Protein backbone atom coordinates (compact mmCIF):
# COMPACT_ATOMS: atom_id res chain seq x y z
CA UNK A 1 0.00 0.00 0.00
CA UNK A 2 1.34 3.43 -0.93
CA UNK A 3 2.06 6.29 1.47
CA UNK A 4 -0.84 8.15 -0.15
CA UNK A 5 -3.21 5.28 0.69
CA UNK A 6 -1.88 5.19 4.26
CA UNK A 7 -2.60 8.90 4.72
CA UNK A 8 -6.10 8.66 3.28
CA UNK A 9 -6.84 5.68 5.49
CA UNK A 10 -5.57 7.68 8.48
CA UNK A 11 -7.84 10.69 7.91
CA UNK A 12 -10.81 8.47 7.13
CA UNK A 13 -10.42 5.92 9.92
CA UNK A 14 -8.52 7.62 12.75
CA UNK A 15 -9.38 11.27 12.18
CA UNK A 16 -12.92 10.43 11.02
CA UNK A 17 -13.03 13.11 8.35
CA UNK A 18 -16.26 13.30 6.37
CA UNK A 19 -16.47 11.37 3.07
CA UNK A 20 -16.53 14.67 1.16
CA UNK A 21 -13.37 15.92 2.89
CA UNK A 22 -11.58 12.62 2.26
CA UNK A 23 -12.62 12.78 -1.39
CA UNK A 24 -11.19 16.30 -1.70
CA UNK A 25 -7.91 15.24 -0.11
CA UNK A 26 -7.70 12.23 -2.42
CA UNK A 27 -8.41 14.37 -5.49
CA UNK A 28 -5.82 17.04 -4.61
CA UNK A 29 -3.01 14.65 -3.67
CA UNK A 30 -3.54 12.29 -6.60
CA UNK A 31 -3.68 15.28 -8.97
CA UNK A 32 -0.21 16.31 -7.76
CA UNK A 33 1.12 12.76 -8.08
CA UNK A 34 -0.29 12.41 -11.59
CA UNK A 35 1.19 15.77 -12.59
CA UNK A 36 4.60 14.47 -11.47
CA UNK A 37 4.16 11.70 -14.03
CA UNK A 38 4.27 8.85 -11.49
CA UNK A 39 1.87 6.48 -9.74
CA UNK A 40 1.01 6.63 -6.01
CA UNK A 41 3.15 3.50 -5.48
CA UNK A 42 6.15 5.35 -6.95
CA UNK A 43 5.69 8.46 -4.81
CA UNK A 44 8.76 9.21 -2.66
CA UNK A 45 8.68 12.47 -0.68
CA UNK A 46 12.47 12.59 -0.52
CA UNK A 47 12.67 13.05 -4.30
CA UNK A 48 10.26 16.01 -4.33
CA UNK A 49 11.65 19.55 -4.33
CA UNK A 50 9.98 22.83 -3.42
CA UNK A 51 10.17 23.79 -7.09
CA UNK A 52 7.92 20.88 -8.00
CA UNK A 53 5.18 22.23 -5.74
CA UNK A 54 5.60 25.79 -7.02
CA UNK A 55 5.43 24.58 -10.63
CA UNK A 56 2.32 22.57 -9.83
CA UNK A 57 0.68 25.66 -8.34
CA UNK A 58 1.49 27.57 -11.50
CA UNK A 59 0.02 24.72 -13.55
CA UNK A 60 -3.21 24.81 -11.53
CA UNK A 61 -3.59 28.55 -12.07
CA UNK A 62 -2.46 28.91 -15.66
CA UNK A 63 -3.28 25.60 -17.32
CA UNK A 64 -6.19 24.33 -15.24
CA UNK A 65 -7.60 27.83 -14.73
CA UNK A 66 -8.34 27.35 -11.03
CA UNK A 67 -9.14 30.32 -8.85
CA UNK A 68 -6.71 31.26 -6.08
CA UNK A 69 -9.10 29.84 -3.46
CA UNK A 70 -9.15 26.44 -5.20
CA UNK A 71 -5.37 26.41 -5.57
CA UNK A 72 -5.00 27.26 -1.87
CA UNK A 73 -7.27 24.34 -0.99
CA UNK A 74 -5.13 21.98 -3.06
CA UNK A 75 -1.96 23.24 -1.37
CA UNK A 76 -3.63 22.91 2.06
CA UNK A 77 -4.36 19.25 1.27
CA UNK A 78 -0.76 18.68 0.22
CA UNK A 79 0.50 20.51 3.32
CA UNK A 80 -1.58 18.27 5.63
CA UNK A 81 -0.27 15.21 3.80
CA UNK A 82 3.29 16.44 4.24
CA UNK A 83 2.86 17.14 7.94
CA UNK A 84 1.52 13.62 8.41
CA UNK A 85 4.56 12.16 6.59
CA UNK A 86 6.89 14.21 8.81
CA UNK A 87 5.09 13.10 11.97
CA UNK A 88 5.16 9.44 10.94
CA UNK A 89 8.75 9.30 9.74
CA UNK A 90 7.90 9.01 6.04
CA UNK A 91 10.20 11.95 5.30
CA UNK A 92 12.54 14.30 7.15
CA UNK A 93 12.38 17.10 4.61
CA UNK A 94 9.88 19.91 5.17
CA UNK A 95 9.67 21.67 1.83
CA UNK A 96 6.09 22.87 1.99
CA UNK A 97 5.57 24.82 5.22
CA UNK A 98 7.04 28.00 3.72
CA UNK A 99 4.92 27.84 0.53
CA UNK A 100 2.75 30.94 0.59
CA UNK A 101 -0.93 30.89 -0.38
CA UNK A 102 -1.99 32.53 -3.63
CA UNK A 103 -3.19 36.10 -3.59
CA UNK A 104 -6.66 36.63 -4.92
CA UNK A 105 -5.67 39.62 -7.09
CA UNK A 106 -4.93 38.78 -10.71
CA UNK A 107 -1.45 39.40 -12.10
CA UNK A 108 -0.72 40.51 -15.63
CA UNK A 109 0.42 37.60 -17.82
CA UNK A 110 4.18 37.26 -18.24
CA UNK A 111 5.41 37.18 -21.83
CA UNK A 112 8.69 37.13 -23.76
CA UNK A 113 9.49 40.40 -25.63
CA UNK A 114 9.61 40.25 -29.44
CA UNK A 115 13.37 40.69 -29.76
CA UNK A 116 14.15 37.98 -27.21
CA UNK A 117 11.63 35.63 -28.81
CA UNK A 118 13.39 36.10 -32.15
CA UNK A 119 16.53 34.76 -30.48
CA UNK A 120 14.61 31.79 -29.07
CA UNK A 121 13.17 30.95 -32.50
CA UNK A 122 16.61 31.23 -34.14
CA UNK A 123 18.06 28.77 -31.63
CA UNK A 124 15.13 26.41 -32.16
CA UNK A 125 15.62 26.50 -35.95
CA UNK A 126 19.23 25.40 -35.38
CA UNK A 127 17.99 22.50 -33.25
CA UNK A 128 15.49 21.40 -35.86
CA UNK A 129 18.20 21.33 -38.55
CA UNK A 130 19.71 18.40 -36.63
CA UNK A 131 18.83 14.73 -37.12
CA UNK A 132 18.94 14.03 -33.37
CA UNK A 133 15.41 13.07 -32.38
CA UNK A 134 15.32 14.63 -28.90
CA UNK A 135 16.89 17.87 -30.10
CA UNK A 136 14.35 18.22 -32.91
CA UNK A 137 11.47 17.21 -30.62
CA UNK A 138 12.41 19.80 -28.00
CA UNK A 139 12.48 22.47 -30.68
CA UNK A 140 9.06 21.36 -31.92
CA UNK A 141 7.67 21.60 -28.38
CA UNK A 142 8.77 25.24 -28.05
CA UNK A 143 7.53 26.13 -31.53
CA UNK A 144 4.09 24.58 -30.98
CA UNK A 145 3.53 26.34 -27.67
CA UNK A 146 4.59 29.68 -29.13
CA UNK A 147 2.94 29.57 -32.57
CA UNK A 148 -0.29 27.81 -31.57
CA UNK A 149 -0.88 29.24 -28.09
CA UNK A 150 -1.55 25.80 -26.62
CA UNK A 151 -2.10 25.01 -22.97
CA UNK A 152 0.27 22.50 -21.40
CA UNK A 153 -2.51 19.93 -21.05
CA UNK A 154 -3.50 20.42 -24.70
CA UNK A 155 -0.08 19.63 -26.15
CA UNK A 156 0.37 16.79 -23.66
CA UNK A 157 -2.86 15.17 -24.87
CA UNK A 158 -2.35 15.84 -28.59
CA UNK A 159 -2.08 12.90 -30.99
CA UNK A 160 -0.61 12.52 -34.48
CA UNK A 161 -4.11 12.29 -35.93
CA UNK A 162 -4.89 15.78 -34.63
CA UNK A 163 -2.53 17.22 -37.26
CA UNK A 164 -4.27 17.57 -40.63
CA UNK A 165 -2.87 15.59 -43.56
CA UNK A 166 -1.61 18.78 -45.21
CA UNK A 167 -0.02 20.01 -41.94
CA UNK A 168 -2.06 23.22 -42.07
CA UNK A 169 -4.31 22.72 -39.03
CA UNK A 170 -4.33 21.08 -35.62
CA UNK A 171 -7.40 19.88 -33.76
CA UNK A 172 -7.06 20.92 -30.11
CA UNK A 173 -9.08 19.44 -27.25
CA UNK A 174 -9.28 22.11 -24.55
CA UNK A 175 -11.05 22.61 -21.25
CA UNK A 176 -14.32 20.76 -20.87
CA UNK A 177 -13.35 18.64 -23.92
CA UNK A 178 -14.17 21.58 -26.17
CA UNK A 179 -12.56 21.12 -29.57
CA UNK A 180 -11.16 23.98 -31.64
CA UNK A 181 -9.15 24.04 -34.86
CA UNK A 182 -6.00 26.18 -34.91
CA UNK A 183 -4.19 27.04 -38.17
CA UNK A 184 -0.54 26.06 -38.59
CA UNK A 185 1.64 28.50 -40.54
CA UNK A 186 3.68 27.07 -43.41
CA UNK A 187 7.10 27.15 -41.76
CA UNK A 188 5.77 25.40 -38.66
CA UNK A 189 4.07 22.77 -40.83
CA UNK A 190 7.47 21.97 -42.38
CA UNK A 191 8.99 21.66 -38.90
CA UNK A 192 6.28 19.19 -37.86
CA UNK A 193 6.90 17.20 -41.07
CA UNK A 194 10.58 16.94 -40.14
CA UNK A 195 9.66 15.73 -36.65
CA UNK A 196 7.22 13.14 -38.05
CA UNK A 197 9.86 11.94 -40.50
CA UNK A 198 12.38 11.33 -37.71
CA UNK A 199 9.75 9.77 -35.46
CA UNK A 200 8.82 7.16 -38.05
CA UNK A 201 12.20 6.60 -39.70
CA UNK A 202 13.84 5.97 -36.32
CA UNK A 203 10.93 3.78 -35.14
CA UNK A 204 10.32 6.04 -32.14
CA UNK A 205 6.57 5.54 -32.43
CA UNK A 206 6.46 1.75 -31.95
CA UNK A 207 5.40 1.76 -28.27
CA UNK A 208 2.88 4.60 -28.45
CA UNK A 209 1.64 5.12 -31.98
CA UNK A 210 -0.84 7.91 -31.41
CA UNK A 211 0.84 10.43 -29.06
CA UNK A 212 2.19 13.54 -30.81
CA UNK A 213 5.09 14.30 -28.47
CA UNK A 214 7.11 11.22 -27.53
CA UNK A 215 10.16 10.27 -25.51
CA UNK A 216 13.03 8.53 -27.31
CA UNK A 217 11.50 5.27 -26.00
CA UNK A 218 8.23 5.98 -27.75
CA UNK A 219 6.22 6.97 -24.69
CA UNK A 220 3.99 10.04 -24.31
CA UNK A 221 5.94 12.74 -22.47
CA UNK A 222 4.59 13.79 -19.07
CA UNK A 223 3.44 17.36 -18.50
CA UNK A 224 6.35 17.82 -16.11
CA UNK A 225 8.85 16.83 -18.83
CA UNK A 226 7.25 19.24 -21.29
CA UNK A 227 7.64 22.01 -18.72
CA UNK A 228 11.31 21.14 -18.21
CA UNK A 229 11.96 21.24 -21.95
CA UNK A 230 10.46 24.73 -22.28
CA UNK A 231 12.20 26.03 -19.16
CA UNK A 232 15.59 24.75 -20.32
CA UNK A 233 15.26 25.96 -23.91
CA UNK A 234 14.10 29.46 -22.94
CA UNK A 235 16.84 29.86 -20.36
CA UNK A 236 19.46 28.65 -22.86
CA UNK A 237 18.25 31.40 -25.20
CA UNK A 238 18.65 34.06 -22.53
CA UNK A 239 15.06 34.43 -21.34
CA UNK A 240 15.05 35.68 -17.77
CA UNK A 241 12.29 35.32 -15.19
CA UNK A 242 9.45 32.86 -15.65
CA UNK A 243 9.90 30.34 -18.44
CA UNK A 244 7.03 27.91 -18.87
CA UNK A 245 4.59 26.67 -21.53
CA UNK A 246 2.04 29.17 -20.28
CA UNK A 247 4.52 32.03 -20.69
CA UNK A 248 4.75 31.01 -24.36
CA UNK A 249 0.94 30.94 -24.57
CA UNK A 250 0.87 34.47 -23.12
CA UNK A 251 3.59 35.49 -25.57
CA UNK A 252 1.57 34.11 -28.51
CA UNK A 253 -1.49 36.14 -27.49
CA UNK A 254 0.39 39.34 -26.64
CA UNK A 255 2.39 39.33 -29.89
CA UNK A 256 -0.77 38.75 -31.95
CA UNK A 257 -2.50 41.65 -30.23
CA UNK A 258 0.50 43.93 -30.71
CA UNK A 259 0.49 43.05 -34.42
CA UNK A 260 -3.13 44.16 -34.74
CA UNK A 261 -5.06 40.89 -34.42
CA UNK A 262 -8.70 41.20 -33.35
CA UNK A 263 -9.37 40.35 -29.71
CA UNK A 264 -12.18 37.95 -30.61
CA UNK A 265 -9.96 36.10 -33.05
CA UNK A 266 -7.37 35.68 -30.31
CA UNK A 267 -10.12 34.47 -27.98
CA UNK A 268 -11.02 31.76 -30.49
CA UNK A 269 -7.41 30.70 -31.02
CA UNK A 270 -6.79 30.45 -27.26
CA UNK A 271 -10.00 28.56 -26.62
CA UNK A 272 -11.28 31.09 -24.07
CA UNK A 273 -14.99 30.69 -23.34
CA UNK A 274 -15.22 34.34 -22.30
CA UNK A 275 -13.79 37.46 -23.94
CA UNK A 276 -13.03 38.74 -20.44
CA UNK A 277 -10.26 36.16 -20.08
CA UNK A 278 -8.67 37.38 -23.32
CA UNK A 279 -8.93 41.08 -22.46
CA UNK A 280 -6.17 40.74 -19.87
CA UNK A 281 -3.69 40.81 -22.78
CA UNK A 282 -4.73 44.35 -23.65
CA UNK A 283 -3.04 45.45 -20.42
CA UNK A 284 0.26 44.02 -21.67
CA UNK A 285 -0.14 45.95 -24.90
CA UNK A 286 -0.91 49.17 -23.02
CA UNK A 287 2.20 48.69 -20.90
CA UNK A 288 4.27 48.18 -24.05
CA UNK A 289 2.82 51.37 -25.56
CA UNK A 290 3.80 53.27 -22.42
CA UNK A 291 7.35 51.94 -22.71
CA UNK A 292 7.56 52.89 -26.40
CA UNK A 293 6.18 56.33 -25.59
CA UNK A 294 8.73 56.94 -22.84
CA UNK A 295 11.61 56.00 -25.16
CA UNK A 296 10.47 57.43 -28.50
CA UNK A 297 8.20 60.40 -27.91
CA UNK A 298 10.19 63.67 -28.30
CA UNK A 299 8.26 65.39 -25.51
CA UNK A 300 9.14 62.56 -23.14
CA UNK A 301 12.81 62.48 -24.22
CA UNK A 302 13.27 66.15 -23.37
CA UNK A 303 12.43 65.63 -19.70
PLM region descriptions:
Residues 1-303:
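Conserved catalytic core of the tyrosine transesterase superfamily
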